[in-house]
Amino acid sequence: MFHLLKKEIINMAKMSSINKNNRRIKLSNRFFNRRKALKKIIMNKNLSLEERFKAQQKLSKLPRNSAKIRIRNRCQITGRPHGVYRKLKISRIALRQLGLQGKIPGMIKSSW
C-alpha cells in the first residue's frame, strides 16, 4: 500500500540515518535479555554491593547502541524523525498525503 507513496513524497531522510537507526534496533533486540538481567541484578538490594557493582560494570561494557533509549521513532515511509504518530508509525506529512490521496479509509479533508 505504502510503496506507491515513496515516489510521490520527495523529502526523504538520509539513508545513512535510517540505516543507523535500523542497526540500533537490531542491536537493542539482540542484547535486550542480557541488559534486562543485568539491570535486575543491579536493582536487587538483597545482593552484596560487590555483585551489584560487577553487574554495573558488565552493563557499561555492552554496546551503547544496544540501549533502547538510543532508538529514534522514524516514519516508515519517509524516514522523517519528527512529527511521527507512534501507533501508525507515519509522520504527520505522510499521513496528510495518504489522506488526501484517499488511501486511508474514513479520512477526509475537513471543512467548516
Predicted regions and their residues:
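Short cysteine/histidine-rich metal-coordination sites, predominantly Zn2+-binding motifs
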Residues: I90-G99
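Intrinsically disordered, Lys/Arg-rich N-terminal extensions and targeting peptides
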Residues: F2-Y85, Q97, I104-W112
